[in-house]
Amino acid sequence: MALCAIAFVPCSFAAVTAGFSPGGTALNLILQFAGSARQSVDVAAYDFTSQPVAQALAASVARGVSVRLVADEKKSRDRWSLVSALACAGVQVRVNGMYSIMHNKFIVTDGSAVETGSFNYTSSAEKRNAENALVITGEPETARQYQTEFNRLWNESSPVACSADRMN
């Protein structure tokens, strides 16, 4: 019997799963995590050029999942950025220019689980860099903290509309 059940404190059975790149385990973990959402996917991203992650987010929108992205304002203007394309795919997008760089890289699904790590949502992170990604489930306080931070970033950021000239 778990100690928490005996002591009348809430039980938390956390699971932490790690993925690494190059090699695909980080990307696969992120794709599986984003695809598992039933109600919401909230993404904070410094750089966003990954076609597979963009496709996973667009597929979530198509399934009726609410998807929001806060991206770094300067990086979102890069030639290969998919930020505008995501807005055109139905993702609610905002850009944040409040900091030297908005360097976050995390996803919160359904307000209850978190993916975080060094992995930018880019092709380079997948194929050229040594990166990591962690998925944390069963830790409601951790998820609450990340959701609160996402909401703070969202509220201070500027909306992005679909722009046909920036669709990739």
Predicted feature residues:
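Sec-dependent signal peptide recognition
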Residues: 1-3
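N-terminal signal peptide c-region/cleavage motif recognized by signal peptidases
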Residues: 9-10
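Short N-terminal segments immediately surrounding and downstream of signal-peptide cleavage
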Residues: 14-38
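Primarily the HKD phosphodiesterase
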Residues: 32-92
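Extracellular/periplasmic catalytic domains that process cell-envelope and extracellular macromolecules
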Residues: 35, 62, 86-87, 100-102, ...
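Structural recognition of the beta-strand scaffold that forms the well-ordered cores
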Residues: 42-44, 68-71, 94-95, 107-108, ...
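Solvent-exposed loop/turn segments at secondary-structure junctions
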Residues: 47-51, 73-77, 99-102, 113-114, ...
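Signature of lipid phosphatidyltransferase scaffolds
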Residues: 109, 113-168
